[in-house]
Curated annotation (Swiss-Prot):
Protein name listed in UniProt: Uncharacterized Nudix hydrolase P35G2.12
Enzyme class at the top of the EC tree: hydrolase
Keywords: Cytoplasm, Hydrolase, Nucleus
Positions of the Nudix hydrolase domain: 51-189
Keyword Nucleotide-binding tagged: no
Lineage, broadest ranks: Eukaryota, Fungi, Dikarya, Ascomycota, Taphrinomycotina
Amino acid sequence: MSQDQKPKVLEVSNLENQDAKWTSLKKIRWQDEKGKIRFWEMAERTTRSEANVDAVAILAIVPIDGSPHVLCQKQFRPPIGKFCIEIPAGLVDSKESCEDAAIRELREETGYVGTVMDSTTVMYNDPGLTNANLKIILADIDMSKPENQNPQQQLDDGEYIENFPIKLSSLQEELFSLEKKGFAIDVRLSTFALGLHAGLKYLSS
């Protein structure tokens, strides 16, 4: 990934709902189990698809030298002011299925063409803060296919994404190493790594 200069946050200011494109801030009036009226602040996604899912993240598995690797990304994220290690992801278009969105986003962000193998249930990112949700789609990348021989990203203006593989057997260890180097680790990738580690520890015996 070639860049002229290192990205950085220049200013953070308040944003009115009428000026926001992707999210809005809402106040919820609700009643608890005792009948008491309470209030809650929430951030709301304003771009939800007809599938009632905001986004997909793609857990793309690619074989390298006979070993499965997960395709990861490095991308600067302004809300945290640092580079984040994550997996390919993006919003689901209005009339798009989650599976189609996953294949499209994978190709746009990495250049690879994948095959959907499985998916999670609808998952809520931070239900104490927002209604934003997503599905994680498991996809295989067949490196023998002609379309995967010379992958070319199709990034939008302002997108700068570096893709790199991490071996599944050392994913947890590698993420800790990257964190020590100053990178943020996305919750989806970190949770997968912990689940993989726990599965190998508790289910292999």
